[in-house]
């Protein structure tokens, strides 16, 4: 895609990589924002939690589940950095004021339900509800983190969507995730339910095998989610729509069916 990002030090990995087909043959783009496995030194130095504890917040191995996408003519965008370090399926400035000892700029969204649940762009809590950082964060460092990881990822994704739409007249973005097998009262997931609810209070539901999220019909054409539902159900999987996950930032930000860009979030139950 011509989007190689250079950093001040070679020790820092690129924020993403793209697995591309020899030639893109379908108007599909796959993205895996929560499967990154790089836990930077600055994160590990600032937390009392182990890498194993932090990794429970991730959608581990989801990028591998979709690794065959290029063989079928579609590109796959894979995040490199751990979700506990930075959540790419959030607005860029969903930051928790309690994590800072300085006043945050006006453009920061510190009042979303995701932030309230400890699961903003820079998560405050790990999957088990433990606090990630022992001390306050510096806003300048967080801004640099966003510039280094968040914005390059989304610039790349936006370019992939644009290129696909130009080539095929449309683009279907599949945002790939995994989910715990059952809901609980800890804020372990935190993606959108009912347009932004953190998912707390769902109770201990037994979830389906697959949850498809289209923001209640606003992010993709109904024919697309209907087709996905029929196809997956036909494989013997138990499929739910928009419950408990209707789709996060990526789904509602990129999904513009009226312009030919459709976004669908897929959650795969980890018990599978």
At which residue positions do the language-model features occur?
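N-terminal catalytic or cofactor-binding beta/alpha core of small enzyme domains
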Residues: 2-173, 178-272
């Amino acid at each position: 895609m011509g989007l190689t990002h250079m950093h001040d030090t070679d020790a820092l990995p690129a924020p993403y990589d793209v697995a591309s087909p020899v030639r893109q043959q379908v108007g599909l783009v796959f993205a895996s924002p929560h499967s990154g496995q790089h836990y930077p030194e600055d994160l590990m130095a600032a937390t009392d939690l182990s890498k194993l504890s932090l990794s429970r917040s991730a959608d581990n191995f989801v990028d591998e589940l979709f690794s065959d996408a290029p063989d079928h003519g579609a590109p796959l965008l894979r995040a490199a950095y751990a979700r506990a370090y930075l959540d790419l399926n959030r607005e860029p400035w969903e930051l928790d004021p309690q994590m800072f000892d300085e006043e945050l700029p006006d453009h920061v969204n510190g009042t979303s339900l995701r932030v309230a649940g400890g699961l903003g762009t820079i998560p405050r809590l790990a999957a088990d509800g433990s606090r990630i950082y022992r001390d306050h964060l510096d806003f300048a460092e967080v801004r640099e983190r966003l510039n280094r990881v968040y914005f390059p990822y989304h610039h790349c994704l936006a370019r992939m969507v644009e290129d696909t739409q130009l080539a095929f007249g449309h683009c279907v973005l599949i945002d790939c995730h995994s989910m715990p097998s059952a809901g609980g009262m800890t804020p372990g997931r935190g993606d959108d339910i009912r347009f932004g609810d953190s998912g707390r209070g769902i109770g201990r539901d037994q979830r389906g095998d697959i949850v498809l999220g289209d923001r209640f019909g606003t992010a993709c054409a109904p024919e697309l989610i209907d087709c996905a539902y029929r196809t997956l159900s036909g494989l013997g999987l138990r499929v739910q729509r928009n419950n408990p996950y209707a789709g996060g930032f990526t789904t509602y930000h990129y999904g513009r069916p009226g312009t030919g860009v459709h976004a669908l979030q897929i959650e795969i139950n980890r018990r599978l």
